[in-house]
Amino acid sequence: MRAVLIILFVFGLHQIVWSQEGLIILQNESIEFEADGFYINKVEDVRANKENIGFMQKGVFAKTKIDANLKGGVEKAIYNYLKENFRQDTNGVPIVICITQLEISESSGLPITGKAKIKIDFCREKNGSLGKLYNAEAYVEKPAVNVSKTHEERIREVIVSCLESFNNSDWESISPMFFKESEKN
């Protein structure tokens, strides 16, 4: 009986260690510019792998990689962040943000750096179809004393970089081709 309990304990501990996940909460920090003639109507996560957004390391000396995710999921976390922190033109054009890539990681060597990469398609919606207006991507890599605690800053930075790029583009002059999701494949 004792052996069975030990085996169950070790197996249970193994499951707990391997199922750990680092949740990242995007902090409220106002975006310094405002939308020029648009508002974010929706955020869609169209990444091929939606299981996580990368990894973070846990522990001081014996670092363990654990999956990282945005609290509430990518769509909800980014939409709520923009809703609270980005001054938008609610009388403007509704824009759908499609997240095609979002990845974070940490280097293992010294100095330890945190990395964030994002790719976003900015789209208009018409009769249930999306038409791409603009594509933006951003990458940032920065050292930090506690890299895992600063992932959210880097995620916000790459989101804002793409948003500013779209805001400064000539998106209003583009006539997109509209495709339903099933027609793309």
Regions found by a protein language model. Give the residues of each.
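A structural "domain/chain start" motif
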Residues: 18-79, 83-93, 110, 129, ...
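Bacterial Sec-dependent N-terminal signal peptides
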Residues: 1-26
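Surface-exposed short loop/turn segments
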Residues: 84-130, 141
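C-terminal/domain-edge helix-coil "capping" segments
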Residues: 141-185
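Proline-rich, low-complexity linker regions of envelope-associated factors in Gram-negative bacteria
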Residues: 63, 126, 146-149
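Residues in flexible loops and secondary-structure boundaries
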Residues: 9-12, 34, 48, 105-110, ...
